[in-house]
Amino acid sequence: MSNPAVLFLQDVLQEPKLIDWEWIGENFWEDIVPAVQGHIFLSFVSVAVALVIALPVGVLSARYRKVYPPVTFVTGILYSIPSLALFAILISIPGVAIGPAPVIIALVAYSLLILIRNTVAGLDSVPPETIDAARGMGLTNRQILFRVELPLALPVIVAGIRIATVTIIGIATIGAYINGGGLGQLIFDGISRQFPTMIITGAVLATALAIIADLLLLALERYLRPWARARRT
């Protein structure tokens, strides 16, 4: 008996009309735009929640080095769990239903390692003489952190946000498997209906979102490095 996936692939390759523009036009506002909005919502909320957790943990890890190894160990384990397995674990927890909530929890878990590492790396990149100069001016440790260290570390932190955002946008497509919504819904619906237009539309738009987010955050990262711009000019 032939494999259904192989038969579907053969049908796709033999079908000259991979993109049904009429379907896209008819379903643009009803299906495609809400899917894009849902994907942006999942990604934005996940990055925001992850930042709220990662920034203080990263600062704590930079200040107290004994904290850093166990933090990276735990977040590294979370990062290494396959996405479908993590989704399955989350929805098996009592009180956690399928939908956007477990998807956001999983996406936050995946981005913590990247954000914490970059926060620590950014704070480590601040020259010690700069901190000594700030302390000599009478600034407290809290003032040094918020007025000196974090502003100088911001480009490295934004680089971590950039990597985490692109990662989240990609993994969020799989969240549709547990009714998380987003562009993954188009992809999974297209697979179930054997309708290539939905699959391609979801995949192309998810890729476009990742590229746009990457370029915007790259521009922000370069803007926050005025010394690098000065060297280029």
Stretches with model-predicted labels:
Residues 183-220:
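Hydrophobic alpha-helical transmembrane segments of polytopic membrane proteins
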Residues 57-90, 107, 117-121:
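Cytoplasmic-entry segments and transmembrane alpha-helices of multi-pass inner-membrane transporters
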Residues 123-153:
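Short helix-to-coil transition segments within interhelical loops
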Residues 44, 142-174, 201:
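Transmembrane alpha-helices
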Residues 31-42, 91-114, 154, 198, ...:
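Loop-to-helix entry region at the N-terminal start of transmembrane alpha-helices
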Residues 2-46:
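Periplasmic/extracellular loop-to-transmembrane helix junction in inner-membrane transport proteins
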Residues 221-233:
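Short cytosolic juxtamembrane segments of multi-pass membrane proteins
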Residues 52-57, 102-105, 109-131, 154, ...:
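Membrane-embedded alpha-helices of multi-pass transport/permease systems
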